Regions:
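N-terminal secretory signal peptides that target proteins for export/translocation
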Residues: 1-9
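Intrinsic-disorder/low-complexity regions
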Residues: 3, 24-25
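Generic alpha-helix initiation/capping and coil-helix boundary signal
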Residues: 6-7, 17, 94
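Bacterial N-terminal signal peptides
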Residues: 12-23
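Short S/T/G/P-rich N-terminal loop/turn motif that feeds into the first structured element of a domain
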Residues: 26-111, 116, 120-234, 244-263
């Protein structure tokens, strides 16, 4: 009898440990993101990339189990208009990158629908270069959130920003400013509809972080930044000595989602 009770206690203890471990893993799990940037030089390349993404790549990603792929183009007034197309791919783990390559390489429909893209000649390439960026979500914003914007996609604005830092250590202070300093909370409070915040693990502008916010239109974006600059919490946070000079360069793009974007 004592042996049975001891075995039962051991079983219960083991199950509790497994449950707690599972809970901990789920609690601290963070998304990864791949951002692919197609650099283009003219309307012909833009049309080629859009046709490939809409008719071949996005459907293939859906078949591979990746259901939420964002595709964005700079708005007409953005300096990058007509020169870039951004593709945002949320990942649950880094190994998903290998899984995507494995799934897509065996997708015959992708090869058929994307034939013009894959078989493009050396003197008529559909793009100039492709840039790939890998990010890990901030602990203070571990999962991507798809905004609910009550306007047509043609009016919606997604702002993508990249903050570079002078050194890795200084860059970590800027990440800290978002995570525990309260900068993410300010964005939430002001209804900036954050999509993601992430630290760049691989990319050409490291050390840097990137994040995306969203708005129903251009005017809402402008109003947000005016309110942000005047916010009392931001004034206190930005005045802290430990966070000064944590950003050495900022890149920003105002983007519209395409009509076939999942975000």
């Amino acid at each position: 009898m004592k042996s049975n009770k001891k075995s039962l206690r051991h079983f219960i203890t083991t199950m509790l440990f497994i449950l707690l471990l599972t809970f901990a893993n789920n609690t601290f799990a963070r998304d990864y993101y791949q951002i692919k940037v197609y650099n283009i030089k003219n309307a012909e390349q833009e049309a080629q990339i859009e046709n490939y993404l809409k008719m071949a790549y996005i459907p293939a990603m859906h078949r591979a189990g990746f259901k939420t792929i964002g595709v964005f183009k700079p708005i007409a007034d953005d300096p990058a208009a007509g020169t870039k197309i951004f593709v945002l791919i949320p990942l649950s783990k880094v190994s998903d990158i290998d899984l995507i390559e494995e799934k897509l390489s065996g997708d015959k429909e992708l090869q058929t629908m994307g034939k013009a893209y894959f078989d493009a000649s050396f003197d008529n390439a559909p793009y100039e270069r492709i840039e790939s960026i890998l990010l890990k979500a901030f602990s203070g914003f571990p999962e991507m959130k798809i905004p609910e914007l009550a306007t047509p996609k043609s009016e919606q604005v997604f702002e993508l920003r990249s903050y570079q830092s002078s050194t890795e250590k200084i860059g970590q202070k800027k990440v800290e400013m978002f995570n525990t300093g309260g900068e993410i909370d300010i964005f939430k409070k002001l209804n900036a509809n954050p999509v993601f915040f992430g630290e760049v693990l691989l990319g050409k502008d490291m050390p840097n972080l990137m994040y995306m916010t969203s708005y129903k239109n251009v005017e809402s974006n402008q109003q947000l930044w005016q309110a942000f600059g005047n916010d009392a919490d931001w004034k206190v946070l930005s005045a802290k000595e430990e966070y000064k000079n944590t950003v050495s360069h900022i890149d920003k793009w105002l983007l519209h989602p395409t009509d076939y974007s999942d975000i």
